[in-house]
Amino acid sequence: MPLRPQEIGSIQSRRDFCKWMGLATLSASMPLWTPPVLANSISSKWLTIESIERVTLNVPFRDIPARAMAKEVPHWVYSEVLQVKLKSGVIGFGETMLFYTWKTTSDEVVKEAIGKNAAEMMWRDDLGAGLQIALFDAVAKSLEVPVHALLGTKIYNETPLSWWNIDTSPEDMAAECKLAHQQGYLAYKTKGRPWFDLWAQMEQASKVVPPEFKIDMDFNDTLLDAERGIPILKQFEHYPQVDIWETPIPQSDIAGNSRIVKEMKAKVAMHYGNPEPFTVFKEQACDGFVLGGTAQTLMNANAACKIADLPFWLQLTGTGITAAWSLHFGGVLSQAKWPAVNCHQLYTHTLLTEPIVVKNGKATVPDKPGLGFELDQDALAKFRTDKPSVRPDPPRMIETTWPDGRRMLLGSHGVLNFILKQANLGNIPYFEHGVTTRLVPNDGSAQWKELYDKAGPEKPLFL
């Protein structure tokens, strides 16, 4: 079990801890890690970027994720796959989730990259996810080494992975947990939301998986504060499957998060970087982190977490392409001890010719050149589509009902995460037993449109 912040073994006293924290704070503005420089003796002809091909895909969700994702994030089906060809003929590939990523790849950076040395460009933070992955893949293939060899020393031969789905009905959550376990996973991450019955979700899911299978829940602030959140969380401590609560309340509430850490048996995770990491370390506001972003971001954050002796899970999301990329970081980052969340389980296809195999909760870190997987060209042809100019956002309306007969309608009205935003504003009733939510099909009728127009975006419509 990972050490909680108050149990950091390398620090012998609170006084030593504070002294160390002072030094750490002084160094917070300095890079903790710098990217390596490949030998200049490598002929530029092997690493010069000759062309970059970009293809937009619409990769369908599986049935259960399709029902769940349709409410707030139907646009997650869109990815851009990039194939970088070097003068040597080597081709590297990568992907960007077009509407959920640390950065998309711009036309300008693609134009700039042509004729440049791939090894000199690959660490840049402005590349966008897909181009960065593709460059690393191409360079590693050219050197006949796995991507992880470009990142550092491999210290783990296997790395833990988590199954992911957004908030669902208790029945669908149990079905997903069961499927995850059948496919070798020992962790499942989902969302904790006041528009679903948390008690029914945990009860049904815990019945279909063994105690060693862990369930992590991301609240995205919806518990609102420690005073109200702690009594809710304590009601789930008897489940052996409960493992990590992510962002139970706003991360800016350092005192509240510190209180939750101290009072909960389960661990607390926060997104790295907000608030400033060394403040979180000092105030013991979490047990570990959620970590995503550029290659340099990941390496630097790992260095900081190593000093603090805190774990994290990698959260690099997309299809199997991004999951393959994540495996290499899982092999070299010492603090990547919690199961990585890649979300590739959502889709009907991994975009790889072979799946990522998980056994006993872990996947093997590839040792073949590049990413260690091959791109499925047939899948690219099958799922190819036009690139949307803006985030696709069809009008959607959800209906939430409670056992006492209350009904709530809320329309999307062009607002991203439109239900979550209302919950964070306190406009949705707090967590209750028996609550459930469904997407109201848009039948094109005047009645549907009338209700939709009344239901938001400023506040939900209660009937």
Give a label for each model feature.
Residues 109-111, 118-119, 241, 252-267, ...:
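Shared catalytic-loop signature of beta/alpha-barrel
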Residues 31-68:
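C-terminal segment of N-terminal export signals and the immediately downstream linker at the start
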Residues 152, 156-260, 264:
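Metal-dependent enolase-superfamily TIM-barrel catalytic cores that perform enediolate-based chemistry
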Residues 89, 144, 245, 326, ...:
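Conserved, mostly hydrophobic/aromatic
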Residues 46, 50-55, 70, 82-146, ...:
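Metal- or metallocofactor-binding catalytic centers and their adjacent structured scaffolds
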Residues 1-13:
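N-terminal secretory signal peptides
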Residues 28, 353-463:
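C-terminal extensions of enzymes
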Residues 13-31:
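N-terminal export leaders
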